[in-house]
From Swiss-Prot:
Role noted for this protein: Catalyzes the cleavage of glutathione into 5-oxo-L-proline and a Cys-Gly dipeptide. Acts specifically on glutathione, but not on other gamma-glutamyl peptides.
Family: Belongs to the gamma-glutamylcyclotransferase family. ChaC subfamily.
Name of the protein in its database record: Putative glutathione-specific gamma-glutamylcyclotransferase 2
Source organism of the structure: Bos taurus
Coiled-coil features, chain-numbered ranges: none
Amino acid sequence: MWVFGYGSLIWKVDFPYQDKLVGYISGYSRRFWQGSTDHRGVPGKGSVWGVAYKLPVGKEEEVKAYLDFREKGGYRTTTVIFYPKDSTTEPFSVLLYIGTRDNPNYLGPAPLEDIAEQIFNAAGPSGKNTEYLFELANSMRSLVPEDADEHLFSLEKLVKERLEGKQNFNCIKRPN
């Protein structure tokens, strides 16, 4: 069994796997439309780059149960075709965790500035949403430097601007 990661499963791999491949799935777009600290893709045009992990033989159900718990909060699974970056490897089926529009955490489309503000202010048991965004952006630059994920990198820029603005605000002193 192979599982496709396109958010924290790329940079926070806390489960056993036998093999991994960089590649993409088609017909989806990466968006920050989930009202939790998680980042999930939504069906649509385009493609989403990420990493497919082959779960260890004999441990598939155990690892899947862990991932089901980790990816809770309005997600369902579906099977999609994965296209490895290495074109000598044939495409194959992977399991995809995806946020659904009918879950209570789904926020839907919003202006990038609003999403950036949400990310800037959001924190939960798994940490700050800014960490999630920056780890994902750095991972994508490293894994697939040729992919210009406009949504992801625009959000990263807007959130960094907010952080810089906060630091500058904290450095302002009153004149004596």
